[in-house]
Amino acid sequence: MSTHLTETWEKAINIIKGELTEVSFNTWIKSINPISLENNSLKLAVPNDFTKGILESRYKDLIVNALKLLTSKKYNIDFIVTTEEKIEKNHNNEKSNIVVNDEMSTMLNPKYTFDSFVIGNSNRFAHAASLAVAESPAKAYNPLFIYGGVGLGKTHLMHAIGHYILHNNPKSQVVYVSSEKFTNELINSIKDDKNVEFRNKYRNIDILLVDDIQFIAGKERTQEEFFHTFNALYEANKQIIISSDRPPKEIPTLEDRLRSRFEWGLIADIQAPDFETRMAILKKKADVEKLNIPNEVMVYIATKIKSNIRELEGALIRIVAFSSLTNKEISVDLASEALKDIISSKQTRQVTIDIIQEVVANYYNLKIEDLKSARRTRNIAFPRQIAMYLSRKLTDMSLPKIGEEFGGRDHTTVIHAYEKISNNLKKDESLQNAIKELNKRINQK
């Protein structure tokens, strides 16, 4: 970075500082780093897309005017989302030692690395297993199966494994794909008669990372193709990493031959973060995004938001935005006001049959209409009985009302469902785990 650019920018932000409140300046302007100044174009590095959006909509004209006051020129401002590390490399004209092709770089999120992952009691085992696999692909645990609820860090760990392997061996062929994308590509390959290309893409590689594998349940052709892909990679001593929202034995309508293969290696779960981990996550986020958040505010967030990492980080950003837009200092009172809709809805929302039907349908990869339909196939009838059981346990609705909500069924059908699930729970461990998971998801709604 040239001395001229540095001096010009420092003078500009001194002018801008006089036009803003301290909280607005520290939150939005202080985090900017100048990258380059060419002709009438100034490139400025910002830490994230959220900051970029705020700067473009609220502060861009202020920056342009400050520079015009200094130089008598009107500059075009271009905000670039990047990190300090990337800025430094650009300044020094250094080449990255990680060599990946364009397709690879778009598959792995640069933010999801082991360094940015916050370790706590809830995820320590999954993190250790992921690092072991990254250090010794196909030698430590193969496959590695990571499961846990939404927003707990499964995808983060999978991307971190990919980055780590590419850093140590840039020539490795690493492919990250969601099960939905895998299915769509398979369908297109059949339609376009490109089966060979599809198989080459997923079988002639070193590392396969498949996210949300539970969505292939019930898709016979996809399961068939993935079975052969799994076998080809495993027999060639290539690493397979899989994520899901539940363990293999609880994925409904998954073929037994796939289920058993998923259990060949190591199964690691991620739980909701405890208070200490939630605090660490918030501090890490504030540090990365260069946000000045009082400790008591982070304690407030960590106490009120308990379900997952995404909601924690979302609450933090919401508070910062609320502070900037209202020109108020960040405090517990402001945090309470900013999050009142989120917190009150979590604290007061009652469990309803609609919520139960939504959660059960999602868990078993069904539509809510299936639970209300007249269809009696086991893959629908059993989840329907579970939903009726939970409706009886978790709501104050009468038996006739519950029956009515499930396609106008008689109250005796509800009684039968309740008794059947109650009896099965006494002897079926997998059902016990399913009910436990469903209860947790219902409570998080």
Curated annotation (Swiss-Prot):
Entry's Gene Ontology BP terms: DNA replication initiation; regulation of DNA replication
Annotated spans, Domain I, interacts with DnaA modulators: 1-73
Pfam families named in the record: Bac_DnaA, Bac_DnaA_C, DnaA_N
Residues the record lists as binding ATP: G151, G153, K154, T155
SUPFAM superfamilies: P-loop containing nucleoside triphosphate hydrolases, TrpR-like
PROSITE patterns assigned: DNAA (PS01008)
A single GO molecular function term of this UniProt record: ATP hydrolysis activity
Region of interest (Domain III, AAA+ region), residue spans: 107-323
Keywords for this protein: ATP-binding, Cytoplasm, DNA replication, DNA-binding, Lipid-binding, Nucleotide-binding
SMART domains: AAA, Bac_DnaA_C
HAMAP family, per the entry: DnaA_bact
The protein's name: Chromosomal replication initiator protein DnaA
Source organism (scientific name): Clostridium botulinum (strain Langeland / NCTC 10281 / Type F)
